[in-house]
Amino acid sequence: MKSSIQDVAQLAHVSISTVSRSFTRPDLVSKTTRDKVMKAADELNFSISRSAAALKTGRALRIAVLVSGRINLWFSSSTIEGLNEIFHNEGYDISIYQMSSIEERREFFDMLPVRRNVDAVIVISFDIDANEIEQLRSVNVPIIGINSSLPEERGFSAAVRIDDKQGSELAARHLMALGHRDIAYIRTNRDVTLHFSVQGRFESFMARCKENGVTPRVLVTDESKNNISKVVTQLLSLDHMPTAIACQEDGIAVPLLFQLERNGFTVPNDVSIIGYDDSIYARDLGLTTVRQKPIEMAQEAARMTLDLIEGRPLEQPFKTFPAQLIVRSTTAHLHR
């Protein structure tokens, strides 16, 4: 448990204001008293530099990060890595609030009034509604989105996102250019997931296909441990196997690739597979996918957050990062 300024004051037998002055205005404190405070701080492993900055600025030096789903997923972990690289160097901590269910989401916003000790709130891939935005705004700190829904319309202070419409259209055009018309799209259950980005991704893919006279079959999976096995069961239960499969994310495409090959299918000869993310294993497996760069997006979001905290105006508060199609070896021209 971290020691507080109150703990230091109690151990040094001085007031909290004396501890504060020892850090921020040492010229107003006698050497004897200041030495007592510093000795107590050392014994309690109290962070002098951090506390001094907090006391001087009146800030918490803490950023709240709202994450939908599991934080060990590639996108979430990469985003947190990018945020931490910037915030850590500036003396800020990150408090992560993970919301994997509607209940956890409701609990967070119900408890929001007691969570005012943050300097900004960052919302990652979260399909947040107008009422929740108003609740966040009541804390009176900047709200920054990363791949979040309608950030400009819903009152975010700033936001970064990948162009999911462009990315999905690139994936759809790629498969159709290879001659595929019998396409399946695998996605997570929207009633379960709180991700916004994947919903826009799905809608754009379907729209591009339908514009070209193709109606993909949609398979829905959950986020359980055996979800890919269930998807393979769904695929094998179809009247016939699709010639191409587009996956909502690499986290579905990578295990699907292995499961299909275990069931006797050769990728891409029997079926083409395309993912979305260009995650850590995509290159080694030769997965055709759509690249996004969550670390870079998060770093930019963190820099904008710091500017907003300091009251500096942003030249471009809402930024869109382009998607990129990465063609590897899991997609090929239609063979049948």
Identify the meaning behind each predicted range:
Residues 3-4, 58-173, 236-240:
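Alpha-helical recognition/docking segments in bacterial nutrient-uptake
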